[in-house]
């Protein structure tokens, strides 16, 4: 009876051959990540609906909001089974786009009628919807996400941020974009939905409305960087990541100063598109 070989015939057996095989696997992985990581983000969207794991996406969204560490621990097990850090299922991404689109509808109705004191016509609502959709999805989510993912991809693949034993490890661009998607969830929740519910208070133009509006914006943006830190801190080959939390320190200072009369909800104004 013949058996399949457990190692290549052109490599010696033993520790030396194993090291050469490992080096070859690492080189193949690096080439694959460099050539396919960005296109993979696009290819994920063309899976059939029956292959979408909506239950897992819902679980991830819930725990990213309430238990972010637990959500990121699941990524480690994905790495063990699928040999990649980035998601291979677009369900989370599709969920997020759907929620942003829903918020665009809500804010387009508000902006076309209640906010601008204009007639609530169907054409006005549709116009505001497409304008809001383009600004929220293209500008706020995609362009901002592309910039953040690219910055961290270029930065964290430098040797300064890797342990000496893991210099050949690569931070995938697709994973960097996944981290952005995870972190953007809190902005989506706080500024796209909760802010809408709190508009009657935020629009009162007093110190209480100033406090609530500024707290909401600073919490959402600050939490974006905290979740970003959790995401990259999950990678076992990275180090010196505390710099990711520096924007939260700056936001804390801005928040305290803003309480003396600077309305951040009006200055940043996510929805006056």
From Swiss-Prot:
Lumenal topology ranges: 111-134, 197-216, 264-273
UniProt region (Disordered), positions on chain: 1-33
One Pfam family it belongs to: UNC-50
Cytoplasmic side: 2-89, 156-175, 238-242
Membrane topology: Multi-pass membrane protein
Subcellular location: Golgi apparatus membrane; Endoplasmic reticulum membrane
InterPro entries: UNC-50
Keyword terms of this UniProt record: Acetylation, Endoplasmic reticulum, Golgi apparatus, Membrane, Transmembrane, Transmembrane helix
Superkingdom of this protein's organism: Eukaryota
Residues spanning the membrane: 90-110, 135-155, 176-196, 217-237, 243-263
An annotated GO BP: vesicle-mediated transport
Modified residues (N-acetylserine): 2
GO cellular component: endoplasmic reticulum membrane; Golgi membrane
Subunit annotation: Interacts with GEA1 and GEA2.
Protein family per UniProt: Belongs to the unc-50 family.
PANTHER family: PROTEIN UNC-50 HOMOLOG
Stated name of the protein: Protein GMH1
Organism field: Saccharomyces cerevisiae (strain ATCC 204508 / S288c)
